Amino acid sequence: MAEFVRAQIFGTTFEITSRYSDLQPVGMGAFGLVCSARDQLTNQNVAVKKLMKPFSTPVLAKRTYRELKLFKHLRHENVISLSDIFISPLEDIYFVTELLGTDLHRLLTSRPLEKQFIQYFLYQIMRGLKYVHSAGVVHRDLKPSNILVNENCDLKICDFGLARIQDPQMTAYVSTRYYRAPEIMLTWQKYDVEVDIWSAGCIFAEMLEGKPLFPGKDHVNQFSIITELLGTPPDDVINTIASENTLRFVKSLPKRERQPLRNKFKNADDSAIDLLERMLVFDPKKRITATEALAHDYLAPYHDPTDEPVAEEKFDWSFNDADLPVDTWKIMMYSEILDYHNVEGVPQMEDQQFPPQ
């Protein structure tokens, strides 16, 4: 039985195994507190995330289960990886991941990025997205603070808490506004992996310019700012809007022509402008894919088609529509944790049918 030690962080009790020491708070989110710590087994610095009340409601229990399943499935150099998971005596769940020194948001607010760093960071983002999308996963909340970077400029995408299946009827109000694709704002209905490409385009533009490209104050202002640069959406995009109110709003906007991105990004080279043009397209189906972006001239210095892997298999989303009680999610979660630690002789849930028969 592991020995647990307690520490108070921001008024929150961290109850972790004695394997980890030197807890220091590094971030607070809606669903958990993250601390840095020293892994005394590997002598490496790690990030320890405490999930707040993971079994308080069926919705939170499912979210916790989904996050763990994604952690276990997504194994790629440009995606954050799980190094340990445990349940404390108080039944809190802790995820332990590698610790990277900073994130893209902090880098962008501290100094301008040189061209070779912009290229290398964008290459790694696209390399990670190629893999994630091939697994049938949409991140949905890609933004600079979710892109971690270490001192060697290695980049990893993190925080798949909002990630969901590729689903033509996907719904929700999800990513941070500045980086949110127009199809999320306009329809709240149909979107897919292309939303991540839009977000990556906004991040690319921010790396080039040093400030957010579309800093909207609210949804209406956000969309207006986008149309000032990219023009009015084409009719075939407008016709996909499901909400009558949204449709009226879009049709009430003054007609605008798309502005040449060259006018805004005067110091960027032509290949950067061309790639950005292909990422920031209103019609999701005409947006460049991660695989296509990797082969673009702008990323040629780093492109290696033999070292840009895809997922071996699609992520299994069959649990996602299941409406189960907390205790069932908890049993399934415990089973996944034991499986992660290769504990033999535990009841497995692989044969669980969703929804249960």
UniProtKB/Swiss-Prot annotation:
PTM annotation, UniProt: Dually phosphorylated on Thr-171 and Tyr-173, which activates the enzyme.
Q: What switches its activity on or off, per the activity regulation note?
A: Activated by tyrosine and threonine phosphorylation.
Query: Which keywords appear in this protein's UniProt record, sorted alphabetically?
Result: Activator, ATP-binding, Cytoplasm, Kinase, Nucleotide-binding, Nucleus, Phosphoprotein, Serine/threonine-protein kinase, Transcription, Transcription regulation, Transferase
Q: Which reaction does it catalyse?
A: L-seryl-[protein] + ATP = O-phospho-L-seryl-[protein] + ADP + H(+); L-threonyl-[protein] + ATP = O-phospho-L-threonyl-[protein] + ADP + H(+)
Q: Name one GO biological process term.
A: stress-activated MAPK cascade
Question: In which residues is ATP bound?
Answer: 26-34, 49
State the superkingdom.
Answer: Eukaryota
Per UniProt, the short sequence motif TXY occupies residue numbers 171-173
Stored SMART domains: S_TKc (SM00220)
Where it sits in the cell: the answer is:
Cytoplasm; Nucleus
Broad class of the protein's primary localization: cytoplasm
Q: What does this protein do?
A: Proline-directed serine/threonine-protein kinase involved in a signal transduction pathway that is activated by changes in the osmolarity of the extracellular environment. Controls osmotic regulation of transcription of target genes.
Q: Which family does it belong to?
A: Belongs to the protein kinase superfamily. Ser/Thr protein kinase family. MAP kinase subfamily. HOG1 sub-subfamily.
**Could you tell me what this protein is called?**
Mitogen-activated protein kinase hog1
Gene source species: Hypocrea atroviridis (Trichoderma atroviride)
Instruction: Report which gene this protein is encoded by.
Output: hog1
